[in-house]
Amino acid sequence: MFYIIESDHQLEWLKNQSNEGGYIDIISSNDNYHPLLTQTICVYIRPTNSDQGFIIPISHDEGLNVDKERVYELLKTFTPLYTLDKKNLLYHFNLQSAIDLSLVYSMNKFDRLQIPDGNSTINWYYNSYGDKTDLNRLIPIAKLHERCEKVYDSIKQYISLPIPSGFDFYNNLATNVFFLIEQSGLGIYYEPFVEMFKPRNPLFNTIDNRVLTSYNLYNATSRPTNSFNSINFAAIPHTQEHRRAFKPQNDYFVEFDFDGYHLRLLCTQIGHELLDESAHKQLAKLYFGKEEITDEEYTQAKQINFQAIYGKIPEEHKNLEIFVKIQDYIDQMWKMYKEEGWVANPQSGKEFTTELSDMNPAKLMNYMMQ
């Protein structure tokens, strides 16, 4: 049976297989490059009711390529449509209803979905020509299809996992927000940037004097992290030397800091009202019993607050009303977790279940605040 879709007849046949949904994988021009810098080479589609997947070439040297817009119209007929990484998919097709299978897995299993390596042919091409921008255009379609089939066979069992509580928040809102943020990147002075950060290959994620990153939503807590090509925006040193590698837009760097973000979230959940002034300063007044707070006392108050947020309430302050409320909140949350087997984050709706290992009240509080 054919597996390469190249003719109108084959496209129509494949469309008739879409009524039960399917799984899609994008073959970009080079897996090493940031998705913003790639083109769509092929699409792998595996109808749910089929015992094999199909490759649709869009800009491959070996195939009778199909117009990308026609492929897009075809893909919209598959419902439900699963994919390994929805955010990556959006760089190629605006399929907002797609279901991120890696996200389904991570929210059910509190771990990252592991994907098998490619075949020996693909590995040889990447070891030999990994910097070539359109590398996947040169790899035989049969080998690309073989890799996609291998990946699908390893993950198909997880399509039956239940859609977890809070999934829509991450699959739709969070995915789209970080998809947009990623495309902005950070302005750089190219040579100082390369000298200081030493990326494996700067071409993998730089364009127009901007460096790009990729956000990961597949952590156990679902707190986003970012990294691409050895660059982590959250770990850039705050030194003047390192700042010289970055170029501000419109001549200015603007720094924002949400005052007591996690503390304010917690106070909202326990019903403790905070005023508009600094949250840390308000609580410092309680700790030290006075209105005027020194810089040293403010720093001490921040340390106390961070400890309390993650369930470590100082003994000398545990009788203050706010800490009584926090302790009650922790106790009730832990009781529900032990008795019901789960608790849900009030912001996102994500559930944390007893599948999490080595859980304790302080760790559970940490997960809830992330």
Task: For the regions a language model picked out, list residue spans one by one.
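Acidic, glycine-rich two-metal-ion catalytic cores of nucleic acid-processing enzymes
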Residues: 2-4, 18-19, 29-41, 45-50, ...
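RNase H-like, metal-dependent ribonuclease domains
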Residues: 12-14
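Helical catalytic core of nucleic-acid polymerases
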Residues: 90-165, 174-184, 229-360
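Non-catalytic nucleic-acid-binding/docking modules located in mid-to-C-terminal regions
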Residues: 98, 172-173, 188-193
